[in-house]
């Protein structure tokens, strides 16, 4: 690499500052609860239509007029392009090329199938092809045109021994393959010789030189023509199924017409379709001398098809309003009318005698196909049919669904005959229009509706719109009957509406879908600007759509912002990235994913994810199935919180299964178990292989390091999410908490229980004596498969809530798989909340209050005091608890067992004598005589003696290990040490009654601990677990003997502690070693810490007796409500019904868009996403967390609801959103606070026009507010990464390949990895989030000085960011802040009336002393104190 460019990032040299504007902040108003009316207003957009088309079309007509007239064309045949010697030969009449040797080599049978309708037009077709450059053939499905017309051409070549090379396009891969195989079978040719196929890069061409008839997909031919820029490799080009008007087909027509008019005038083009608009196509290819002839090969049907409309169905009284062309949809009355139609059909067949068929025979042959627009409508129709079945027992039917997301088993069910006595009713979307033919369908009910995907090119948000179907669609649907017998079609609209209002043809894909790939093809073709090329389309798009597409391509790095150095809003020079994207059969963002995968050396992972996002239906549709189906998303996501990671893991599992040679039946069972589609996975596998081959051809190969630069799975997971964030910029969303302000409400709603383990129901009645129904509440979770013994059910005192807390039991029932979920939250919480999506109302039968009171009195359950029931409870002797006293700050003792830094057990040295005495008592030979002889005597929860380190200690049985029945072992937990061991019966002893009397109720002589104020660093943490190195440091400390703990807080009997070292403490050391990062303690912990500090400050003024009393009250308050698991009353006594709502969680959260186009919209997550149940996975952490969506769709009346699809929760690394934005955005503006002492927000986008100061792409401008410190050195590191990413594919103008070689790539990868690691592992100070009203305003970045140097100039995809200079905070301001801080500490122990005040360091309004105390404990305030130099105790 150029040394001068490398010196640009040499940190040993002086950092020269460049002046830049001191811009002010913009912010995501929703994410930080800031109101701004301006942001709620929609962006004003100027839509430019099709006036631009006229001039380009006229020029093209002049070219078309140069095509030779028919008498000139008659004797001509093509040379191959390779035979041409000069451009002049294009204008000359080419010599006739013979191919006699080829024709002698293969057997040619000239007897064609005369029974096919197309045969009658054979001579007419051949003559038309010989006499015209373009011929249009219209023929119904089944007439034989696809297989026969190319053979007719080839047969003519055989007769005259003239050279033929025919290519035939098909819109679908499977069609190209099956038709080629059928032709080979018919002609008795070996596959891949005379006739073959090519789909993607997959070819069946055994002898490529001999192939004269090639069937391929539309995209394959388009790529060939774009690369060759001529048609002359072929003599005949046959475009089949032209009516489908896919985007590739429309652009292929542009290319063919242009090449016909320039350098390929002697190639023959044949356009074929069943429902073609011949006049439109004929006009498109016409010149001033002639127009292409249209040959109609339609034929009459052998069976009649009767069509009926809504107003013709006299026996059905259709009530309600008339159809509205502007309001497509199905009313309840519409569904009911369809049901009535079905009943009429059934009744008609019961009474029909003239056909001579029995009713059972009519049932077999009389299946009904109902065309519905989508899966939601299929579900509604299904529900209506079920209701009908419940009320009408005469008619029996078998319901079958048919849509694109079906599993293979469901697809097969469509073709299976219904059981005897049952009528088959198929409910289908438009997938059944042409792809599927079911032989036994005799009736069609058509609502004349469909759902079509439209994309708003301004925002790039897609929406699935419900529209009226075209007449062409309706005719295709009607064509599903009348093939084997007479049929009937019932259209659920009036005849006049059908004839007058429905359009003849559907909206072409080019007018409703993204145009990125077409624009890239136009740039690769180099025959005009994208605007010029797309103006020549059969249906040209709006100019504004083309310009918006150009902006999108500039955003993803496919185009440079300029053309020959000049900015053009409707054009841009193609980048090497764009060249790669044009070669990949993917959406441009997925191609960007592969490019970034190559740069970050995660190429194969990127290919797999891109393929998985392209192929639909990998997971069987889970919206109507149980929670077990949805839970499989979690199984494969494996705690990543990413649908994309889930796709990657699904594929790896599938690949492993294939490599192990799993039998077909076993594969089907595997797919059923995990609710996967083998068909979709097989298609995905083909695409993965295709993409790998394409990448290899593009020289995109992974680096094979001797030792991987990524040290472990956690770092790989981070890097994978980095490229996901980079690929799908700017689809960035900020996760917001359900509780605003502090996290107090999070705990108050659930009465102080652990929100990471607790869900709750509402609408319960406090007078109902809820403790009687705990077992019934536990039975509300059948679909979740959560064992009742893993739940504690408690009730809010005086509230209408029921709390369900899931136990921290690390041992799962046998046969279950442990599933990782993001963060600290229990998997059962996700399962319970997902239950609400299927049913949010749960019935609970209870007794009447007076009957219940009598019941508990009679059964002597608890006590009744003054008419109020007090449930039974287990008494706790708080004076015997080993928990730390409220007055103790420092405790010395031993760490007896370590699970991790987040869970270990501590034994205070004050209990050493007690432990020694107990051990001596337990190990008395007399006590060890009670050997266990019967394994059945040992049950879960039993207290006994178990052997530990050579001595017996008291333990409780956790569970029985039944894996080995001959040698039963038991998992036991040592009560006074905290560890769990798996022991045989020989190492267990039953406790005598004397021992049980003394020690059964004695609390453990230890307490559980976790490290305070720190959490695992995401860069080294998998599943939010503490890294092994951190645990090893704690183990080493424990082995040293006595340990000194500083108690921070005690919450739910778990102490948050700091472990003192000779210098500092372990908590700080872990942060320094980057194994942990600083974090806030949650609200309950801060409350307890504040209470403990105040009690400890007055310890010297309180007597020993009073201290003991206060501590007992303190410990008693720490005990949680108990679930006594009472037996419920008899069902016959429970006569009242309560409808519970829920379950809910206080951790539920929503997301808000950072993009301007999404600011005023409601944002939801796709129900099929692993993040549909979105929770705050680190509730104590106040940092903004980012969610990235692979795609976004809009819905709602005004498209004001966004649905995020294929989402990924980004790592919980402070500043991650800001860092990703700065690395991957095209251009950014760093905004400083008013004092210019720190950066407070980032405005990112395509930039602005230097004269007008207007944003180039306002819709996609986004703002990230900073809640942690990002400094100048961080931006310099980011610039280094951007420069290195540019270096990978940088090529000089005119060069075809990048200049970076393999050695350069290794250097680049190492530099990127090191810089990124430094950025993401840096411990950052918290800063005040500082939103202002001047959002999304670009400042002149050059008015205050020279811009930063750009190493690659205008050929840079990632230009360097300007780094505004920061200043030290004004000393007077600092002194004011220190005074304000001192004032707050003076108020800390204030007991009188308090006037609300503001913490000026944090800009936090404080209404009470208690709020002030807790605020002083937040990490934000502590960091700000350190920043201003306030002396802290």
UniProtKB/Swiss-Prot annotation:
Residues annotated for ATP binding in this entry: 139-146
Top-rank EC class of the record's enzyme: hydrolase
Annotated compartments: Cytoplasm
Annotated catalysed reactions: ATP + H2O = ADP + phosphate + H(+)
Keyword Cytoplasm in annotation: yes
Origin: domain of life: Eukaryota
GO cellular component term of the entry, any: cytoplasm
Signal peptide boundaries: none
Pfam family, one: DEAD
Domain Helicase ATP-binding: residue ranges: 126-294
Family in the record: Belongs to the DEAD box helicase family. DEAH subfamily.
Function, as annotated: Probable ATP-binding RNA helicase which plays a central role during spermatogenesis and oogenesis by repressing transposable elements and preventing their mobilization, which is essential for the germline integrity. Acts via the piRNA metabolic process, which mediates the repression of transposable elements during meiosis by forming complexes composed of piRNAs and Piwi and govern the methylation and subsequent repression of transposons. Involved in the repression of LTR retrotransposon copia.
Protein name stated in the entry: Probable ATP-dependent RNA helicase spindle-E
Organism the protein comes from: Drosophila pseudoobscura pseudoobscura
